[in-house]
Amino acid sequence: MKTLLLTLVVVTIMCLDLGYTTKCYKTGERIISETCPPGQDLCYMKTWCDVFCGSRGRVIELGCTATCPTVKHHEQITCCSTDNCNPHPKMKQR
């Protein structure tokens, strides 16, 4: 009986682990950590300048992605694959 229970526990843990998805920081009204949708296993941080760059700094976008986005003119993009590996630069200063 104990062997059966132990086997069920091990199988359950293995099944739960197979469904694991990455967690990334995401920008919106505020910066939050969210579980990425299935298939989006990378976190990214994209920065660029807009017309207010001189007064407020670069625009920063954080989120999940399936593949690292293509860099466009005047953008900087970094991608990573561990949980919450894309913190906002101001979060790193704490």
From Swiss-Prot:
SUPFAM superfamilies attached to this UniProt entry: Snake toxin-like
Subcellular location(s) per record: Secreted
GO cellular component, one term: extracellular region
Record GO terms (molecular function): acetylcholine receptor inhibitor activity; ion channel regulator activity; toxin activity
Disulphide linkage map: 24-43, 36-64, 49-53, 68-79, 80-85
Superkingdom of source: Eukaryota
Function, in words: Binds with high affinity to muscular (alpha-1/CHRNA1) and neuronal (alpha-7/CHRNA7) nicotinic acetylcholine receptor (nAChR) and inhibits acetylcholine from binding to the receptor, thereby impairing neuromuscular and neuronal transmission.
Protein name, UniProt field: Long neurotoxin LNTX37
Organism: Ophiophagus hannah
